[in-house]
């Protein structure tokens, strides 16, 4: 009798646990379906998550970097013409060139989607990209390594070009399986650990991955505020109406120069790094 009683008690306990688990599963399924259909709730939860990430990111300081060399680097921004006193048009907008302090120990170059295009079906893009990697990206990487600037590789969807050699000191981001906000935070934490506060961007495509990926300029905009686009080390998959003159790349370069940061060139970066330290 006692054994049967204990078995009944155990069975009831097991049934209660099973029922509780079933309720939790049903509740989870209901919430999942509800969130998929309710955009306002999704937006609210996403904003809470983003605020939490920003709060955490701002709570820690960048590590100090000792004995770092500071030079002057020429950068470019764009100023839109909005003169209320005289007649002006959009063509009156102008580039602004200035020299800024550049601390190479606090800088990193992030290379977005430097693809292996050996299987690229568009022959013209494949040829342009091969030339771009050999004549722009490889020299930029060599320049960075010569001056001990951190090189970060961020490939998405395709392997890295066979022309780009990965060295032990390089960082290769492989976090595509994380939620977007976590990818941004992951990069941000890597940079903080190394005392890096300036990101130089290069790679593909100026108006897509380089800009709007979680580790792109737009994705990192709330976590950092010092972005420099290496404008002759970026390219875009152009449209048939824009290929001549690389209009997509150039227009989006202007957009970045207006709203998100500045740009420079490989040559300007080389001159800055090769010059004596600024007083």
Language model feature labels by segment:
Residues 32-108, 127, 138-139, 146-147, ...:
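Active-site-adjacent betaalpha module
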Residues 107-125:
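Acidic/histidine-rich, surface-exposed loop or edge segments in extracytoplasmic proteins
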């Amino acid at each position: 009798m006692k054994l049967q009683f204990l078995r009944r008690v155990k069975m009831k306990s097991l049934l209660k646990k099973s029922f509780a688990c079933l309720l939790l599963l049903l509740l989870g399924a209901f919430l999942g379906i509800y969130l998929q259909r309710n955009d306002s709730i999704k937006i609210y939860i996403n904003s809470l998550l983003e605020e939490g990430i920003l709060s955490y990111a701002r709570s820690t300081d960048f590590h100090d970097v000792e004995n770092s060399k500071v030079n002057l680097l020429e950068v470019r921004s764009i100023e839109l013409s909005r003169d209320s006193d005289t007649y002006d048009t959009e063509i009156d907008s102008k580039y602004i060139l200035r020299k800024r302090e550049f601390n190479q120990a606090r800088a990193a170059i992030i290379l977005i989607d430097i693809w292996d295009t050996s299987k690229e079906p568009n022959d013209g893009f494949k040829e342009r990209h091969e030339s771009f990697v050999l004549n722009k990206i490889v020299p930029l990487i060599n320049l960075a390594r010569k001056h001990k600037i951190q090189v970060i590789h961020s490939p998405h969807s395709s392997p890295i070009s066979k022309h780009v050699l990965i060295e032990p000191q390089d960082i290769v981001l492989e976090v595509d399986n994380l939620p977007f906000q976590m990818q941004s935070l992951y990069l941000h934490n890597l940079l903080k650990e190394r005392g890096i506060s300036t990101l130089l961007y290069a790679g593909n495509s100026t108006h897509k991955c380089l800009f709007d990926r979680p580790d792109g300029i737009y994705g990192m905009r709330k976590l950092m505020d010092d972005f420099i686009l290496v404008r002759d080390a970026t390219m875009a998959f152009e449209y048939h109406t824009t290929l001549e003159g690389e209009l997509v790349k150039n227009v989006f370069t202007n957009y970045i120069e207006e709203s998100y940061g500045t740009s420079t060139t490989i040559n300007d970066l080389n001159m800055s790094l090769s010059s004596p330290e600024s007083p």
